[in-house]
Amino acid sequence: MKEKIIHHPELGEIHLVRKRGIRRLSIKVGAENSIRVTIPWLFPFAAGELFLKQSEGKINTILRRMEKKAAERTPILLPSDPIALRAIKKDARKALATRTMELALLHGFVKSDGTPLIGRIALKDNKSNWGSCSAKGNINLNIRLHLLPPHLRDYVILHELCHLRHLNHGPEFHRLLESVCPMHLTLKKELNRFSIK
């Protein structure tokens, strides 16, 4: 993989990435308006720059849509006061870890000896997701979950627990999520009204 960063006068920093094993040029607009152009390995970076130029209108449409969605969302903000922030982090660590273990045991995310499948639970303050699960069974939860309503916290935790069995979002994952959280589609929509940025 080779990467080149260019600065576009309107779009800002653009990452051009040449990768092996891909056949088409593609553009991804990510969190905080990051833009990545993926280029097949045998193509020059100039091909990516041309593709970017041809796609400017589409990118601007996507950015406007993202801005509109962000404006409609309620941001979940952490306090700027260090003492209050420390207190929230302390409470969150205990409460989210305890609730994750409770839900794991309640819904059968356990080994044959009855212990939870979870490797470890870590709290992070990231801007891209509410939670994640690794192939080793480690669950990372966004500290801001602690500031959400309890039913949304449980939804995110259950979503990550389902990844202990299925590390993708395929049909089996969705069947399992449906079985442990029948209202997951409604809860996902409700969660999307909140922003972690």
Give names to the regions the model predicted.
Residues M1-Y155, L164-K197:
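Active-site-proximal or metal-binding-adjacent scaffold patches in catalytic folds
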Residues E160:
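Walker B catalytic acidic pair
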